[in-house]
Amino acid sequence: MKTGRMQKPGRVAMKNARDFLIVTNNPLLAQCMEDCYELSFFPDCSYREILVKVRDLVYVGHTLYTHPLSGSVKPNETPYKSIAVSKVPHAFSAEQAGIIAECILAADKFPPRTRALSEAVKRDFQLIDYTLLAGALEFDAAAGLSKIKNHE
């Protein structure tokens, strides 16, 4: 349906898993979804660096399928971020570029995290990021988690 207006990120009708790409730094998400979706996994990137990578994709015409600041966890609280974008670039959208640029500016307003996170807290933040994206994609989060539990 072409109306000349962008649908809100997260509201874009996704045809199937082959239509989009997940950009993430979340190792839990990468493990759970690697067999179902195409991933660009950047384990050493920060939350902000993931936003910048997505911005670069949007600038060449990729479409945001999930909102870059989804969820209620502040950017300075969690190190993990996962965003779904179109797998194939289309025409550049100034509206999409504006959304991701504003998200980067919003993330920059928060002071950087200075305290180290325990492994348990990191796992919790990984799970939060994973379940947010799984919900947006209507992915069976429990099945993904059981897949990795069965391989341990």
Residue ranges and their predicted role:
Residues 76-90:
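Short basic, glycine-rich beta-strand/loop surfaces that mediate nucleic-acid
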Residues 33-78:
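Rossmann-like NAD(P)(H) cofactor-binding subdomain of soluble oxidoreductases
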Residues 23-30:
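Short, polar loop motifs at secondary-structure junctions
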Residues 14-15, 32:
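Glycine-rich, flexible N-terminal cofactor/catalytic loop recognition
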Residues 26, 69-73, 89:
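Glycine-rich beta-alpha junction loops
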Residues 49, 56-57, 62, 86-152:
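Internal alpha-helical scaffold of NAD(P)-dependent oxidoreductase catalytic cores
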Residues 1-13:
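N-terminal amphipathic/basic-hydrophobic helices that include classical n-h-c signal peptides
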Residues 18-20:
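Extreme N-terminal starter segment of soluble prokaryotic enzymes
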